[in-house]
């Protein structure tokens, strides 16, 4: 038995990959754990539309009916959105158990990367990656996303790490694991809702084509994933000091209620949504759409690079 027995790829995504067309993977914990129905369904449809408008095929990934689904759509997408309250949150450690036990799960950045790589998708758009939580020196709460980035050949386009995390420690961990952090038209690592964290990226890139060349060579050299940090649009960015005050309040609430481990991030995001009177969610949707557009452009550039490489190989032959 191989991974192919547990992977279900939609016909649209399969045809696109076979034809060398650009495909962008999308995660599903934002659907199952990020916002309520029907806003979650509206959001994913908007994000998929952004990917299409920018020339690529969207591939929303989730665990459903004992399969890792790549390219969830139609009635299944609505079922995923409606069932969010009952769905599990699947990281790397959960995949085998959830595939055997069945049920439905939203995939984290780590699991989405795994499924994308197995399917042959090289570019993935998300909101923000997980990372080192504040206080990790005592809780050891560090996301599996960072380890996955070090070993799986997928480029992740994001608005940095979620602001609720310890961003300096997250970047140090990425450095330890040899994960290159590329700033898309920026030298400052973005902080999800805020455009700047005060921390520097490893390398600034100016275009999707430039990003594609770096990513392609990274993979050709047999190295792991690449993080492309793309700041939230200025029109939707939140004030860094104001959001920090809300984050600190949300963390105090989590500590008071004993919330920890994989329940912590959804709890904090929900509490911050309440404290900002919904502004954080509006910003979240805007940054995901922005990342989807950039990811589609990078996927298109990588597809064109692949086509040129094949042409050169044929010419030499």
Swiss-Prot record:
Question: Which residues does the Swiss-Prot or TrEMBL record annotate as the active site?
Answer: 27 (proton donor), 162 (nucleophile)
Q: Name one GO biological process term.
A: nucleobase catabolic process
Q: Which GO terms describe its cellular component?
A: cytoplasm
| Residues given in the record as substrate binding sites | 89, 109, 143-145
Q: Which reaction does it catalyse?
A: D-ribose 5-phosphate + uracil = psi-UMP + H2O
Q: Which InterPro entries match?
A: Indigdn_synthA-like (IPR022830), PsuG (IPR007342)
Record's keyword annotation contains Iron-sulfur: no
Q: List the disulfide bonds.
A: none
SUPFAM superfamilies attached to this UniProt entry: Indigoidine synthase A-like (SSF110581)
Question: What does the record give as EC number?
Answer: 4.2.1.70
Q: What detail does the entry give on cofactor binding?
A: Binds 1 Mn(2+) ion per subunit.
Give the cofactors, semicolon-separated.
Mn(2+)
Task: Mention one GO molecular function.
Answer: pseudouridylate synthase activity
Report residues binding Mn(2+): 141
Q: Which domain of life is it from?
A: Bacteria
The question of whether Manganese is a record keyword is answered with: yes
Q: Which UniProt keywords apply?
A: Glycosidase, Hydrolase, Lyase, Manganese, Metal-binding
- Which Gene3D superfamilies does this one have? Indigoidine synthase domain (3.40.1790.10)
Q: Which Pfam families match?
A: Indigoidine_A
Task: Describe its function.
Answer: Catalyzes the reversible cleavage of pseudouridine 5'-phosphate (PsiMP) to ribose 5-phosphate and uracil. Functions biologically in the cleavage direction, as part of a pseudouridine degradation pathway.
Family designation:
Belongs to the pseudouridine-5'-phosphate glycosidase family.
> How does the annotation summarize its subunit structure?
Homotrimer.
Question: What is the protein name for this chain?
Answer: Pseudouridine-5'-phosphate glycosidase
Q: Which organism is it from?
A: Sorangium cellulosum (strain So ce56)
Question: Which gene is the coding source of this polypeptide chain?
Answer: psuG
């Amino acid at each position: 038995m191989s991974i192919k027995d547990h992977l279900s790829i939609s016909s649209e995504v399969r045809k696109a990959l076979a034809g060398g067309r650009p495909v962008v993977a999308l995660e599903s914990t934002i659907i199952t754990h990020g916002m309520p129905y029907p806003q979650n369904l509206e959001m994913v449809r908007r994000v998929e539309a952004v990917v299409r408008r920018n020339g690529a095929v969207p591939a929303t990934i989730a665990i459903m009916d004992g399969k890792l689904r790549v390219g969830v759509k139609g009635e299944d997408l609505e079922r995923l959105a409606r069932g969010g309250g009952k769905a599990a949150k699947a990281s790397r450690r959960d995949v085998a158990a959830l595939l055997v036990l069945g049920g439905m799960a939203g995939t984290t950045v780590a699991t989405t990367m795994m499924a994308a790589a197995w399917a042959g998708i090289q570019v993935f758009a998300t909101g923000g990656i997980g990372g080192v939580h504040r206080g990790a020196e005592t809780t050891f709460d560090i996301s599996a996303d960072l380890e996955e980035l070090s070993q799986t050949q997928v480029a992740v386009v994001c608005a940095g790490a979620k602001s609720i995390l310890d961003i300096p420690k997250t970047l140090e961990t990425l450095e330890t694991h040899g994960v290159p952090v590329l700033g898309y038209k920026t030298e400052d690592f973005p902080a999800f809702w805020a455009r700047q964290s005060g921390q520097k990226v490893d390398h600034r890139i100016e275009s999707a084509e430039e990003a594609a060349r770096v990513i392609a060579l990274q993979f050709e050299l047999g190295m792991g994933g690449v993080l492309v940090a793309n700041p939230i649009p200025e029109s939707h960015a939140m004030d860094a000091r104001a959001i920090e005050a809300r984050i600190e309040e949300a963390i105090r609430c989590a500590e008071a209620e004993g919330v920890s481990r994989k329940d912590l991030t959804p709890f904090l995001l929900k509490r911050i949504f309440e404290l900002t009177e919904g502004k954080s969610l509006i910003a979240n949707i805007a940054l995901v759409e922005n990342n989807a557009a950039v990811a589609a452009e990078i996927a298109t550039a990588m597809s064109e690079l692949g086509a040129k490489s094949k042409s050169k190989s044929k010419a030499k032959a």
